[in-house]
Amino acid sequence: MREIVHIQAGQCGNQIGAKFWEVISDEHGIDPTGTYHGDSDLQLERINVYYNEASGGKYVPRAILVDLEPGTMDSVRAGPFGQIFRPDNFVFGQSGAGNNWAKGHYTEGAELVDSVLDVIRKEAESCDCLQGFQLTHSLGGGTGSGMGTLLISKIREEYPDRIMVTYSVVPSPKVSDTVVEPYNATLSVHQLVENTDETYCIDNEALYDICFRTLKLSNPTYGDLNHLVSATMSGVTTCLRFPGQLNADLRKLAVNMVPFPRLHFFMPGFAPLTSRGSQQYRALSVPELTQQMFDAKNMMAACDPRHGRYLTVAAIFRGRMSMKEVDEQMLNVQNKNSSYFVEWIPNNVKTAVCDIPPRGLKMSATFVGNSTAIQELFRRVSEQFTAMFRRKAFLHWYTGEGMDEMEFTEAESNMNDLVSEYQQYQDATAEDEGEFDEDEEVEEA
């Protein structure tokens, strides 16, 4: 089978990772002890993608939990599915990264990285045919961002032909933990542009807005935000976990979604949006699902897709529904909004349907868009970065760990280049390809 090895790094990465395992274990009928209690063969048909079958018929997640301090991992271990993980796969330091990317990437994290790679190697060796790795982390802290990107580049060295996917939580001024988040995020994006194949940008600002506006939660907690993240992660991995034809592995998804290697930052969306513990009374119709999942309010990245154009889109519908109706509605969306899809990639919207809906819903839809509007998110981080960097504010925390200012300057310009590339393809039309060829050569040099 085509296995995926999951890594969660840092506080945020471990919290959303733990929620991800709770949600998909439930969908596959696996209880907190790793025992199967399901009612459908579909639940087990591709269980090997994310789980190892251990002795006594127990299913163990192919998960590695990493942090530079023990706190979050202790709470994962004490949490509802804490006992399902393999105890040897908890790898943690004691010092913490103090929200400092340099500590995660160059000093504290670098000391721990070899013991993490040993565990990753062991997991990879138990795979029959490893398709790739997925990492959950945030870009604003120290461990998930600094050590997370260090792990990515080390894994890239050792497994250059395997797919690397990240679920990256991008910082936002509305839900901010520390003032240096723009530094950590820019340094991380600098790494992700070069070293990942697919990055799902999950944005705290968008999650906060969804909780506040759509779900009417007056005071959203991280628990509420993480509920949305886990629903989205469950949705985008549906094709990988259940039998189906379309985007059934990470590589096929990448081939469909990434027209240019650097432009692999996706905007996820989900419909219907529900709050934690709520039951939905009325199943949405296929037209409603389709309309909602393309709606800017349902995007997990704080960017408005109407400010850009879609290069590619993947949609995953879940539940019992008419395939014909799904196809009609998806065509309908494209025809009505054709100006928002680039015309120089024909058939750039792909749709998959899976019979098994998520818990508590009759039908749901998950949206993955590669939109040029994602540049808004990088622009936002870049502006905050520049404001501090031009005064060299807080830089001593980074140079004190051995970093050079030059690395900041490079990261800043790489992110600004990324923004310009998105802009370039947003403005492109089918006719004027001649001009691009020359640009391309300059960039390669």
UniProtKB/Swiss-Prot annotation:
One Pfam family of this chain: Tubulin_C
Alphabetical list of CDD domains matching this protein: beta_tubulin
InterPro entries the record matches: Beta-tubulin_BS, Beta_tubulin, Tub_FtsZ_C, Tubulin, Tubulin/FtsZ-like_C, Tubulin/FtsZ_2-layer-sand-dom, Tubulin/FtsZ_GTPase_sf, Tubulin_C
Keyword field: Cytoplasm, Cytoskeleton, GTP-binding, Magnesium, Metal-binding, Microtubule, Nucleotide-binding
Top-level division of the source organism's lineage: Eukaryota
Location of the protein in the cell: Cytoplasm, Cytoskeleton
Primary localization class, coarse: cytoplasm
Bias-annotated ranges (Acidic residues): 429-445
SMART domains from the UniProt entry: Tubulin, Tubulin_C
Cofactor(s) needed by this chain: Mg(2+)
Annotated positions binding GTP: Q11, E69, S138, G142, T143, G144, N204, N226
GO MF: GTP binding; GTPase activity; metal ion binding; structural constituent of cytoskeleton
PROSITE patterns from the UniProt entry: TUBULIN, TUBULIN_B_AUTOREG
Alphabetical GO biological process terms: microtubule-based process
GO cellular component: cytoplasm; microtubule
Binding site residues for Mg(2+): E69
Subunit annotation: Dimer of alpha and beta chains. A typical microtubule is a hollow water-filled tube with an outer diameter of 25 nm and an inner diameter of 15 nM. Alpha-beta heterodimers associate head-to-tail to form protofilaments running lengthwise along the microtubule wall with the beta-tubulin subunit facing the microtubule plus end conferring a structural polarity. Microtubules usually have 13 protofilaments but different protofilament numbers can be found in some organisms and specialized cells.
Entry similarity comment: Belongs to the tubulin family.
Protein name as it appears in the record: Tubulin beta-2 chain
Gene expressing this chain: TUB-2
